[in-house]
């Protein structure tokens, strides 16, 4: 088996996380998984949605978008079509759940964090890149809130990162780019904490159904890849 | 550990599938997983969406809805709010992918199958009940199409069924009802083929992250539960 | 003249009203006029719309929908089209006005009743079946509110029921099913109180205009039919 | 009983119909029922909606709107709210059905007539004024189409006109203005042909239910009023 | 050069402003620039939008619409299409900005003025006619508010009027009608105060780019034309 | 007078145009006017909109968007609000008109060019930066189309660039950043061709009206600034 990308099965693409990528947001990161490039910002606003009012807790919500020509063919702009598609809603719900798992909301105070992940260039794995990058922007945003005295403690429970794995020509591979993803039999997105637990596991058989042992092989590959991503996050945040 | 429902950890709720539930659709089923009740219809129309035209293949697409008072609190009607929510879109995409896995589209001819799953009463597990019930309606619809001479062979590759599993007070349990689902630490939806492969595996940690061995225990439970569902589908279709 | 249904001109279809059809709503009924089947729920919520705030009065509002394949041909789901059609809005306005006529709002307290009529299977007369069935669900819902101590007296002023009549091949007939309705020259929907007054009279000439004497003959037929419906409502509520 | 308007019970408001009110439309009329003023245009376009293609028949469809400050309180503009309300849709469906009753579609050729009724100033009875005025614009539009050689005969089967009647302080009155309408117990809109048949009868009890004899008294009053409207239409068209 | 309209280059069309055109609005005007006819109403409501609350200042906002057959070809009704087009939004923003320039908001009190400009018949220059006519309706509305004691002084800082100019066959012309506008190389809309300053200058090269000296010639023509419009406004308001 | 930015009145911000910024689009540029950063892509698709079919001509259309946190305060995402705002539509119409002025559509062949300008970071002047940057992406896209043999000649008639000017504390200044723009009395956007003609001139008095001589001073400043921008475009394209 040879990957279209030429990478070894367990090899991540070159990953880059650039902090303070834009100026206005409390946290702002450009994350690159190879040719996949996503701007992740975290914006803090005082106040919480109605269903949380008066409970002394905070909230985090996420939105996801792609520039129309982030992809090989131009896709219609969702703002001009007048609605977000099912894929967009599915992804932004995943990002929101994943990052909420990183936080202790009772220490966030009555603040809302808006995570915006906007894909500038897509080459597979945009949702997992978004989670991994937004996690860094989230840490930066919490530091800003702390300086403002807006927190009731340290809301950061754990780090979160994500990667995709798949079965390609019968073998598990890590961090699929678009050509690999298009041909893979199975596609699995995995979100983990730095303590080694799973937050989300979403696997889909595109062609043939997958077997328990294939699932386990993919999860092992994902676990290893995410461990590398945690190191990278730590290194970037240490700068 | 005692389940709120009083069931044993590996015990399904009483499942009932009533065929020919309504009169107009090519396939029409009422599926009940305990108090969860869903009407599943399959409607066949000649022709395919534009992206498939001229390829001699068919298509299947799914939509999902809940009656406003299917739930404990009345929810705003999506038709009057003017858009389907993210949860709805996510579920109907899952149903569509799952049922497409049952079919060989090249034998369906240029026909489109519309699967509609409408929840009359919700008590947890509506998406997995929808898939399991709609599979039966799909078989009935194919029989109607066959009689009409609209098929190019037998499009049915395999049966598909689905169930939810979770971790409740540290233990894996099968087929969660709403009170169990609300308190579970982890929620996992599993879609399988009758040959024993996975079509979809979607797990979410609601509270604590889950570990690989917990995932495997849940998958084993799901595999056993789905086996029972396949027997039930077969028995119902044999009538 | 022979009706397609084989019924006598003044003969209703078999009518069935099943109370407590679903579990969550304050009132919940399945109403069947022959093959027309509608789920009617009444949901009570504390509070009133803004235009009524502070007046000590309650409110009732209605919504109507059809499952996509309730009809012979599948109709696009209004939730996914992003708007309710004119027919839907017209019918739900009619249901709301009709049921409000049954109530003394000043005794309802500051509560809002949401009536949802969802057609599972359509065979003509869905709006009149909805009104007749929802009236029973409304009585049940009021009993629940009374037990909760949420009322300021008995808001039930009078019972309301509805039926369709028409001119078919020159003769007035009662309670048209779909094939009769499609061929009728005139279609008239009548809503009455159990004291014998009219709440709504909506007649439309589909083909030839109708004459005053035809209108009176249809109204007489409707009056008789609705009297039977009131007996049926009473019998069902007495159980 | 004294009407707020000071009119006798059977007395219409001053009615004026101004033809060729605007320049572009095939038919264009300003209709005034007292202070109610509506611009009615009829626009002809070659072609028919998809469901009629290839049948050699024409079609007529109607739309209705109010300028935001046509009423005592400004109402939000439907174009900026992003949807037409239920009342609007109900009225434009009524106008469309009423005017289609005037035409033999098989003689219209494959043309579509768009009737637009836009209320400039509202003082009760806008829907019946719209129908009565649009009928005149329709005759003018047919004359234009005839000159263009676009017709397959004379599509005009009969004239149509409409008026509202009601029960006010226990007595039937004709052609209610807004203050009368607000206080009436019953409101009845009647559409008739010049041959004396009913096209639409839509009665609603706003307060007390109405009795058959009240309905008949109202219909008699409407019949007389509409007869006057037909004379007026004829006089205006003769100019 | 001969204008299609036969007018001299610096000649306005016949302008008419009819006050109190409809009955309900605080200010209501029919403005006619030749065959262009627009109803302008100004509606006053107590209260201001949220972003202004508690500042003791008022607000003015504008909306613009066209009747579907105001134009040579019928245009789809924006209310039924479900959104206002870009041209509509652009024009109503221009009208709002222009009329706000006439007012000292701090003297308006916490009132909101809604300006509605609805084009009954279009023949070029609808936006500039709207501004010029709405200005008169605004003065009338302020007089009503003054009588009600709702003002904190005289909010009227200055009068505002607008006209279009263009380059037609190489020469600047004033107040273009539709045929002239369609053929003009450049189209320039100018809004001025009666003290002679510019509020808005919006020029677009439809064909060839325009030169500074052409711009200045057009501005001179506009200045002269707007001076005539101010005289006309004054005369109308003096009646 | 001292500009908040410290720049001389006639001084542009540092301008940077980075070609080939993303990989998929036929033309793709990152344009920076100081802290204002916009991604401009040009996508080519075969075919034209319906109103142009069969004329052998091409078309260019533009869309504009801002990332939610491109600004100081996070703005709601237009895709999730379900409609583009008036400002967005106004700007994208301006961009489209400006770039169409650069092209001879008859030489473009039946191709449509989609220009997408997405603001990553806003600091004033986003619309003029968009036009200036998209012009470069357009040239690159035309080169790609030429290589593909999709053109019928060279469609590039002239270069186009744009800048904003304003009156700040009584003096004309060039290329306003956000703090300058917020305080300026007048804001003028100017689009020119490299032959020195005006394509668009859009001036708005935010505070005091502006005088003809102020307008001329601003235009002179804009002309000089745009000349620098043309040099910059040329230099960038020469690389």
From Swiss-Prot, chains A, B, C, D, E, F:
Catalytic activity: tRNA(n+1) + phosphate = tRNA(n) + a ribonucleoside 5'-diphosphate
Enzyme Commission (EC) number: 2.7.7.56
Cited InterPro entries: ExoRNase_PH_dom1, ExoRNase_PH_dom2, ExoRNase_PH_dom2_sf, PNPase/RNase_PH_dom_sf, Ribosomal_Su5_D2-typ_SF, RNase_PH, RNase_PH_bac-type, RNase_PH_CS
Keyword rRNA processing listed: yes
Keyword annotations from UniProtKB, A to Z: Nucleotidyltransferase, RNA-binding, rRNA processing, Transferase, tRNA processing, tRNA-binding
Stored Pfam families: RNase_PH, RNase_PH_C
GO biological process entries: rRNA catabolic process; rRNA processing; tRNA processing
Residues that hold phosphate according to the record: 87, 125-127
Molecular-function GO term, any one: 3'-5'-RNA exonuclease activity
EC class of the enzyme, as a word: transferase
Family: Belongs to the RNase PH family.
Job description of the protein: Phosphorolytic 3'-5' exoribonuclease that plays an important role in tRNA 3'-end maturation. Removes nucleotide residues following the 3'-CCA terminus of tRNAs; can also add nucleotides to the ends of RNA molecules by using nucleoside diphosphates as substrates, but this may not be physiologically important. Probably plays a role in initiation of 16S rRNA degradation (leading to ribosome degradation) during starvation.
HAMAP family, A to Z: RNase_PH
Subunit structure, as described in the record: Homohexameric ring arranged as a trimer of dimers.
Protein name (database record): Ribonuclease PH
Gene that specifies this protein: rph
